[in-house]
Structures are given as C-alpha cells and as structure tokens.
Amino acid sequence: MTKNEIIERCRWARDHNESHPSRQWPMGEQLAVALVLRDRSWLDSTNHTTETATDMVCERAGLSAFEFTGWLNDIRAALETEQR
C-alpha cells in the first residue's frame, strides 16, 4: 500500500463515492482512505476507531506511528494541491 495507491483511491472516493471508500477494496486501503479523508462516519460503520484504523494501516503499510503522520500529511497535501 503506497502513497500513490492511496492517493488514487482517495481521488476515486472523492469523485465517485461521496468521499467514502469502496467496500470492495482491501480493508487496509479502506481504512487508509477513511483516515485521509477524515471519514469518521465510515470508520464508525466498520467498528473502527481512529486509533485501531491507524494501527492497521501502519501494519499493512509497514509504517511506524511516527512515519504514519508524515505519510498521512503527504497524501492530504497532494490531494489539496490538486483541488486548487
């Protein structure tokens, strides 16, 4: 699960699914997109907290908690740049 893969998933969610992840994607990707797009209602619907989702994404992406913050911010910055 790379930054570019999650950026593409976020674009799709934003453009085609009211900014929600697709339930057809692997769970790690769903959680990553929900975290990037700040989709708390989606996390709630899957019985995940921000903390449990972060833990799972870190595990799947091979990131430490410290690295995750930068990873998340990089993805958000890339998406924000596109919308300007």
Region roles according to the model:
Residues 30-42:
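Short, hydrophobic/amphipathic alpha-helical patches that form generic packing surfaces
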